[in-house]
């Protein structure tokens, strides 16, 4: 593919061929809210950042007095629109199509996670797969949380092994024009 006179590369990783592989949890699956909230609280006390991907898990933490360092949300829970109660100092907006990750989002997440203030990323489209760039950019020990539909919350403790697994998934993705 040739790109001329275009400052913005409009490419995505597409994951249609990986749906089954991506449907399983890639961390600790919590089905008990008390255990989940205790684990998250202890991680924060130890100085690690909490990053949520998904409206529902973000809201569960907020309702229990835990404010994530970074929230990645699309404004929908199982495609219905929940109310936002917490307003963050820094808000970002990105576009991302369902079943894909735009190349530019990797750099955006890396820059946001380097910032001391965190914030909230509003995704025009779908945020589910943004666990991938967030996990690659988070620090060792940080926790990335996402919802596992009809099961519970999945907590990824970021380390080199999980980054290796994420890179392996990316290598299997197909690069397409967005």
From Swiss-Prot:
Biological process terms in GO annotation? coenzyme A biosynthetic process
Q: Which UniProt keywords apply?
A: Coenzyme A biosynthesis, GTP-binding, Kinase, Nucleotide-binding, Transferase
What EC number(s) are associated with this protein in UniProt?
2.7.1.237
Q: What class of enzyme is it?
A: transferase
Catalytic activity entry: 3'-dephospho-CoA + GTP = GDP + CoA + H(+)
Q: Which GO terms describe its molecular function?
A: GTP binding; kinase activity
Among its keywords, does the record have Kinase?
yes
What pathway does the annotation place this protein in? Cofactor biosynthesis; coenzyme A biosynthesis
Chain residues that bind GTP: 55, 57, 74, 76, 127
Listed Pfam families: DUF359 (PF04019)
The UniProt entry's sequence similarity note says: Belongs to the GTP-dependent DPCK family.
The record's HAMAP family line, in alphabetical order, gives: Dephospho_CoA_kinase_GTP_dep
Function field: Catalyzes the GTP-dependent phosphorylation of the 3'-hydroxyl group of dephosphocoenzyme A to form coenzyme A (CoA).
What this protein is called in its record is: GTP-dependent dephospho-CoA kinase
State the organism of origin: Saccharolobus islandicus (strain Y.G.57.14 / Yellowstone #1) (Sulfolobus islandicus)
